[in-house]
């Protein structure tokens, strides 16, 4: 049987070229699965007749890991926020308003945070879980809101389909693990919150 000569190593397979390609890849932006947008709402005393959300502003839309860390480190930490302010991270194209089509039939899981360090840690863990697509029901999630208030801070995870109890409970359980929260977490419908006397007990809990 005739011997078959081994094919010469292609230039692209040499250690030098592979190392150069690896170094270039390490410097390249790390793309996320989808685009996200940071929003903020610095609330002053509203003018008579002003509609809710008039102070809400979109700050930046991003789709790389590097952009996320730059925005978070420089701006979007709760410790950098004054009282009566909100930070939002929502999927690009979704506004953090009840009226948005993606949010209109949804609701939110809410977690109270008694200390700034707790809020900051929970906020960061939630942000990383969202942009890292750690939720099995990630298509159901709209975004998250960090609210800094004198009477107590809180986080709220907004979802799309409030009536789907099984999906919302799964999301709530996963979020509870992510933020390492041990007390009861409640879910409320946006429709309930629009009423003059919304239910304080929530629709679901985990």
From Swiss-Prot:
Q: Name one GO molecular function term.
A: RNA 7-methylguanosine cap binding
What does the PTM comment of the record read? According to the redox status, the Cys-103-Cys-142 disulfide bridge may have a role in regulating protein function by affecting its ability to bind capped mRNA.
Q: Which GO terms describe its biological process?
A: negative regulation of defense response to virus; regulation of translation; response to virus; translational initiation
Carries keyword Protein biosynthesis?
A: yes
For this UniProt record, give its keywords in alphabetical order, as a comma-separated list: Disulfide bond, Initiation factor, Protein biosynthesis, RNA-binding, Translation regulation
Q: Which SUPFAM superfamilies match?
A: eIF4e-like
Q: Name one GO cellular component term.
A: eukaryotic translation initiation factor 4F complex
Q: Which InterPro entries match?
A: TIF_eIF4e-like (IPR023398), TIF_eIF_4E (IPR001040), TIF_eIF_4E_CS (IPR019770)
Which pairs of Cys residues are joined through disulfide bonds in the record?
Answer: 103-142
- Gene3D superfamilies assigned: RNA Cap, Translation Initiation Factor Eif4e
The record describes its quaternary structure and partners as: EIF4F is a multi-subunit complex, the composition of which varies with external and internal environmental conditions. It is composed of at least EIF4A, EIF4E and EIF4G. EIF4E is also known to interact with other partners. In higher plants two isoforms of EIF4F have been identified, named isoform EIF4F and isoform EIF(iso)4F. Isoform EIF4F has subunits p220 and p26, whereas isoform EIF(iso)4F has subunits p82 and p28.
Record's family? Belongs to the eukaryotic initiation factor 4E family.
Q: What does this protein do?
A: Recognizes and binds the 7-methylguanosine-containing mRNA cap during an early step in the initiation of protein synthesis and facilitates ribosome binding by inducing the unwinding of the mRNAs secondary structures.
Q: What is this protein called?
A: Eukaryotic translation initiation factor isoform 4E-2
Highest lineage ranks of the organism?
Eukaryota, Viridiplantae, Streptophyta, Embryophyta, Tracheophyta
